[in-house]
Amino acid sequence: MTKDDLKPHPKGRDAYRLFIPFATRWRDNDQYGHMNNAVYYELFDSAINKFLIDAEILDTAGGTAMFLVAASACNYFQEVAYPSDIEVGLAISRLGSSSINYDLGLFVAGADTTAATGSLVHVNVSGN
């Protein structure tokens, strides 16, 4: 194993099961003219919550399920800026008895490899 084997690398579309489209907004850009790092996390969170709502796991109008973020990470490989159409790829890498590990990839629309990858661990604290 080399040092390069330990470095994060861009992933292809085949690493993800679901793709959720988004469009960047003018306010997403920072003073350097590219998407601010916090926006990546916002997009990852939005994609996960859309998945949970569509799967009827999360009901924002009165459901009892409550998931908290226990860990998250993001690796950046390519700049993204407004205006861009993007997609967040989502895959579940581990499903435990009270937690879910997600793998996420941010793609500029039409690209075959990720501009960024992320991971997030949700813990179900509601007992449902």
Feature locations, PLM:
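Residue-level recognition of the GNAT/N-acetyltransferase active site
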Residues: 25, 77, 108
